[in-house]
Amino acid sequence: MYQRILWKFALTAIVLLWATLNLIPFKETEFKDYLRQEATAQRDELLKLIDRAAQRVQEKKAASVFVALKQIGHEERIDMSKFFPEVRLESSLRNIEKRNDILFEYLLKESKPRLQLGLDLKGGVAFTLEASSLEVAGQQQTVHELKLDKAVEIIGTRVNALGVAEPIIRPVGTNRIEVQLPGVSTKDNPEVISVLRKPAVLTFHLVHPQYAFMPEPLPLAALPPGYVNMSTDSDDASGRPVTTYCAVKRIPEMDGENIVDSRPTVDMYGGYEILLRFNDVGAKKFADVTGANVGRLLGIVLDGKLYSAPRINDRIGGGSAQITGRFTQREALELSNVLNNPLKVKLDVVEQYEVGKSLGEDAIMSAKTAFLISTALTILFILVFYTFGGVIAAVGMGCNVFVILGVMAMPGVEATLTMPGIAGIVLTLAMSVDANILIFERMKEELATGKSLTAALEAGFEKAWSAILDSNVTTLLTAIIMWALGKGAVKGFGVTLTIGIFTTMFAAMIVSKLLLQVAILPGYMKRLPMFSVLQNTRYDFLKFGRAAFIASWTIVFIGVGVVAFKGKGIFGIDFVGGDQVTIAFQQPIDVGQLRSAATQGTGVREATFAYQTQLGSGTQVLKCTTEFEKGGVVVEAIQKAFPQAGFTNAGVNSIGPSVGSEILKSALISVALALLGIMLYVAFRFEFGYGMGAVIATIHDLLMTIGIFVLFDRQFNASMVAAILLIIGYSINDTIVVFDRIREELAGNPEGSLRDILNRALNLTLARTVITGGTTLLTSITLIVVTTGDVNDIAFTLLIGVLTGTFSSLFIACPVFYWWHKGDRRHVEAHRDIAPKYEWEGASKASN
């Protein structure tokens, strides 16, 4: 017996330990304290250096201990890695400054919690970039010709490549871009801005054969006509940086316009270089340039800096080239990133702030309370129906959320936790209880036939397995499509949903089964009390199918009509932009209180506040983002509500959307392909009529949810993209459970008519439908009552989705399946082999 559960126990322990290791450390340690903890060699010397660095910060000679230590190491050529011998650096890296950079970045990252908080919970850094014309290959190009929107898209791609999740990037006015990065501090990472604003203009120049790698630049009078001085850096044998100079032809032989890919690679000496790959046009140009200049040095210049000048030994016709230089791994990755996403405008930093969290303490506390209450209500709800089984479901929920957080924190994922993200996890947990409910309801049916508790346990898991598998696979198809094709929030939702599917399966089929087996198999538990509800019902659901179908689609068309009538009015600031007001103040007020004052009785539907501290001067201002032409209204409202604060309007800017059209487009494409994937999978696993029913029901639920959301005069913002997509998962999950039971009843009941089979399947799954919906409704209603803002909108969306999903499973999906087959089970059997299977023919053994 114990051998049957030993592997489950071992797997559970390994997964939970792995999740724990991913989440450690749980709290941030101040950098200087972390260095004291981790240093294992020459500690006394390091402690003195830390004290000196702290003194520099106190004297305002450095922004942080992190920066001060790097300065000291550079000035005095101290290799800081000697204090941390356990940290392995690149073996080929001899330059002390770069070794210290890599070491300190690693230690800084290790000092922070694995799971980072978003802008709403912790804040971050914000800066404004101003675009101006840029000279490329001798031609002046203007900002208007190149469009600011493209620059916003490119910066977004670069931010994603840096591993920063949930950023805000949007145009401000006609020539500025605002970037907000959660969990980032320019005090510790000042290079982040330069990486994002680097144009990445790559050009190839011939080097004068007589004036290459000189110790000093040529005097201007001695420069050959058409040539300019450029410097390049290298290291000598001791690791000291050495600068040499080349006379480089001013006009490039070709540029990097035709590069289709760049990526870092390791050379034969263990150093890093960048491999470039050209398209056909670029490959021909490069072959022509190298073929015509065999024996010459070809300088590779990026943003006016000469990185390398290799000699052309032969014509290069392979369509690729390498940039060699003194690259660290990080530098190679960053350069590859910017080369893959080149900017064609010059970006200058005009403002730089540390940003406070956008949610006030009161809002955060009320949201935390709501999450705790909703989770407690969900557990209580399950305990009422399943007693000890509810305890097991609650333990499974705990394991589920712990593993989800562990996956989010793992290297390579490193997701940022925001308040809407927490709401999504809480709601996902409420929905994930469905697997346990399916198992318990099946066990209840088996116990009613007189089976022992042990036999009911095995049969319950076996019979629930197909429904759990198919419902999760269809949802997984949706998630993978969003992950692969989506952008921004859509891609992020696809990743999160994929994680949730696997953790839910693990919690239900491994953890819950393990706990039940430990309690039942040794005989500790003789009975499993479960409260029965909606048992032996005989409702004729198909009787109301036509009327329900017409009524619900009428509501859908009304909702779609309202959406069409309102047009862009259904979108919030994230999608259409708005006003950004800079407000000076004398006394800070909690941003939650400011939001309430700005939106109550003023006609303002949306207002977001955040305190920002300008780096350098330390000046603090309040930034408010609201709808177009509402900035003045907001300022008047908060001035009236808080006269003691001394609020004054310091300026208003128009801001663009933070969610680009590409994200909306990717969401629509992902949904369309997901629906096609669902139909094909269901048709393969069941039959085509099932696929039609599932897709039509899902479309119904999406349109109904959007329509009702708009009818209640709510607006769509970035977090709502994920909430709407979540409805697809819930809707198809509900429908598949019903279809799985229909398939089973058709196979086991050869005499019943198709109408009787459908009604029987709907009645048999009714208790599960109501209990699953009830757990999610409890969570949604609690969040709606207690929270505000995006969390409230997400909860409201799921409330509608649960109600419409339950309705469509009963009155849309099944009637469509019934009408598709013209009410004749022979039509079903002609399209799918569902020959009856009887118990005496040998059912498969329950899996371990």
Where are these regions (language model features)?
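Interfacial helix-loop-helix hairpins and adjacent transmembrane helices
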Residues: 1-16, 22-111, 506, 510-561, ...
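Interfacial segments of transmembrane alpha-helices in multi-pass membrane proteins
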Residues: 2-4, 275, 281-300, 361-417, ...
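Hydrophobic alpha-helical transmembrane segments of membrane transport and translocation systems
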Residues: 12, 399, 406-409, 445-555, ...
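Small-residue-enriched core segments of transmembrane alpha-helices in multipass membrane transport
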Residues: 12-19, 391-412, 422-432, 493-508, ...
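Non-transmembrane, solvent-exposed regions of membrane trafficking/translocation machinery
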Residues: 18-31, 38-312, 661, 681
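Extracytoplasmic
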Residues: 118, 129-135, 142, 149, ...
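Pore- and gate-forming transmembrane helices of large, multi-pass membrane proteins
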Residues: 155, 358-378, 397-398, 431, ...
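Cytosolic juxtamembrane regions of multi-pass inner-membrane proteins
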Residues: 430-471, 517-524, 714-771, 812, ...
